């Protein structure tokens, strides 16, 4: 993309893979300002993969050729010229905005080893029964000693809505911004002055630290109790509180999400439930009411500012430590948000709250998956150029160097299940091109009411309800139908004649594997380029499962790394991924958060692993 400007400078921005610290990205070209093809102009690193440089616009000729290069700044020796023809810039033909942004063409074959681990597993001696953000520094020391470059963690957002062990699921966030209090290091905040309470808290801390497994709800309960006491004591100290109050006010001013999150948390405390549908007049968020509540309940609201302030302070200090030791931190963006979340409460128009996301059946789950998240209303999101998503990624960029997009297939299409249904078997892809009655008849198949499942009556359905149906009516387009997933296993299919079965198989295969290729490709291209436009993180997509044929091309086009799991090869007829066959722009791993760990896998399947 070329943009120029009748301004004092022209800014070059290039995205490229990580490179070794001794090398630099530069721009070199046919004019003196760009080194006459000999002396590259050094660019400055502004992210894990983004580089930029400003050059004097007036010193550039009306037209010139150039390329981006990798070079050694100490000698100006060019190690790598980008592929393809020279880039051409013309002041006469190019639009004005002072910016030229592109992706480097070619590769230097940089590789980086790393480790994926949940933060809760990083337990240190004399801890609180769970890993904490500060423990990432200890892991970084180990990575340095073992020559690793990347630490990948599971999502660390606040997930606490029921305050029991179900809240430990890291992919159902209460807020896409707030961090989970379970990861705070209490010792870094201060010490309880009340000796009786201190003794009581210390006794419980030791008990939890001695447990072999994380006692999630007990640890969270203890930490929140200690945090409340610390806040009360610090608030009671006039001199200390004056500084604290100003610090928290500044933190709130820099984070627009914090006020509604804190009020949401307080209302959940007030009503004794995080189910905001049971909050009466508060069932829907209102900015004026939120601000009034915060004014009337300043101390309660400020407590949640206090918690989040220390969480972010500790997280950023840990990340700074990692980066200072040349370790990149990779985060994880879940495919959905919790149904009972601040985001759904504030922006219900962005979600289909009568639907839920999941995944179709596969070799690992014959019933499919139902994650329970509301699906996204992409039509409404597109009205402001996906600002909710753009803000989400921009915020993640302040925390991480690289990001994993969980279930990137959801940007192409999502497996959608009505709220009245529990099984993933009863879903359909959305968006989709459901079949009309005429199209089904063209296959010489009977359009019999007994073979059709309708959701329009709103009654709750169970798996056996679908055993005698071949089609599911589309909820958005009446009289249009999706073939029922895994239809060959139904009694309805077995009741067809052999000729009808053969015809249905053709319809089914065309529908799921060919019909939507271009449609889903365009669906993703409508969203992802806009959402990722200003992101300089290294982006990886979790492209596992029932993958549309268009996914790899879109990911290559957008420079998104694929995920290759050693024990889950994408190539048919192979038992394991062959590393030298995977694309360069990929992350190769021995497993995911849904599989056993490397050590467990080695122990549980020794004969297969040894092959």
Residue ranges and their predicted role:
Residues 16-61, 71-94, 128:
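Aromatic-rich carbohydrate-binding modules that target alpha-glucans
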Residues 26, 67-69, 152:
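Short, conserved beta-strand segments within well-ordered enzyme catalytic domains
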Residues 10-15:
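A short, amphipathic beta-strand motif
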Residues 69-71, 408:
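Short, loop-centered acidic/histidine patches that primarily coordinate divalent metals
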Residues 7-9, 44, 323:
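Secondary-structure boundary/capping motif
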Residues 1-5, 55-56, 90-611:
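Catalytic cores of glycan-processing enzymes that make or break glycosidic bonds
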Residues 62-66:
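Exposed beta-strand face motif in extracellular beta-rich ectodomains
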